[in-house]
UniProtKB/Swiss-Prot annotation:
Keyword flag Cytoplasm: yes
GO cellular component: cytoplasm
Primary residence: cytoplasm
Assembly and interaction partners: Heterodimer of HisH and HisF.
Keywords: Amino-acid biosynthesis, Cytoplasm, Histidine biosynthesis, Lyase
GO biological process, one term: L-histidine biosynthetic process
InterPro entries in the record: Aldolase_TIM, His_biosynth, HisF, IGPS_HisA/HisF, RibuloseP-bd_barrel
Subcellular location, record wording: Cytoplasm
Identification of the protein by name: Imidazole glycerol phosphate synthase subunit HisF
Family (UniProt): Belongs to the HisA/HisF family.
């Protein structure tokens, strides 16, 4: 059985790791290069580096900072933010990324995913989906609910259904979905489990649950109830609430297969 991955996330702005609530009110959370080194030593399974202002500021990812982060990181590294073209993907892979994440560009042109996957393989192409609840599930009425995608760092509504879009980009060649609930981001209230389950059930590739982790039980729920293949968290690790080791031990105790170091 494949091991469930625990992935710290570095949301980077102006060269610093930041953390907010619902994608706003960002506060400083440290130096990304130092954090990459620390998470590597702590036994994280992967690391996610997202330049969260690149698209909004209409620029590419900060390649120099990405390179320096990759140099300190000997676990798989996913880099995203401002990724638009095959050349962007190539440059980030050369900078040290193992996987590259599309977000806003994939919404504007899903074929960019196909072009990148054709060139480099689906195994290194991730599509990040930032979604808000527009209609909560109502099981008694048979309503599965609806979640809308937002782009440009969560600033721009699209009207696009998150579950249907996940199917589209996987058909185009995405090898993984990084799914963030904007409603839960930074709230420490737990993952949006109906959203996570809906997307996990809809696509045949791994889904990373993101947004809302406040306790170790939330990590477990993302897998057991949300169906995620991996769980991503930021605040609980950046600010020392829990360690990677504590998270893995808790998941193992719950019967979830994890890589114990």
């Amino acid at each position: 059985m494949l091991k469930t991955r625990i992935i710290p996330c570095l949301d980077v702005a102006e060269g610093r790791t930041v953390k907010g609530v619902n994608f706003v009110d960002l506060i400083d959370a440290g130096d990304p290069v130092e954090q990459a080194r620390a998470y590597d030593l702590a036994g994280a399974d992967e690391l996610c580096f997202l330049d969260i202002k690149a698209t909004h500021e209409n620029r590419g990812t900060m390649y120099d900072l990405a390179t320096r982060t990759a140099e300190q990181c000997f676990m798989p590294l996913t880099i995203g933010g401002g990724v638009r073209t095959v050349d962007d993907v190539r440059n980030l892979l050369l900078a040290g990324a193992d996987k590259v994440s599309f977000n806003s560009a994939a919404v504007a042109d899903p074929d960019c995913v196909a072009r990148a996957a054709d060139k480099f393989g689906s195994q290194c192409i991730v599509v990040a989906i930032d979604a808000k609840t527009v209609r909560p599930p109502a099981p008694l009425r048979g309503d599965p609910g609806r979640w809308e995608i937002f782009t440009h760092g969560g600033r721009k509504p699209t009207g696009i259904d998150a579950v249907e879009f996940a199917k589209t980009v996987v058909a185009k060649g995405a090898g993984e979905i990084l799914l963030t609930s904007m409603d839960r981001d930074g709230t420490k209230a737990g993952f949006n489990l109906p959203l996570t389950r809906a997307v996990s059930d809809a696509v045949p590739v791994p889904v990373i649950a993101s947004g809302g982790v406040g306790t170790l039980d939330h990590l477990v729920e993302g897998v057991t109830q949300g169906g995620a293949s991996a769980v991503l968290a930021a605040s609980i690790f950046h600010f020392g609430t829990y360690t990677i080791g504590e998270a893995k031990a808790h998941m193992a105790k719950a019967g979830i297969p994890v890589r114990l170091t």
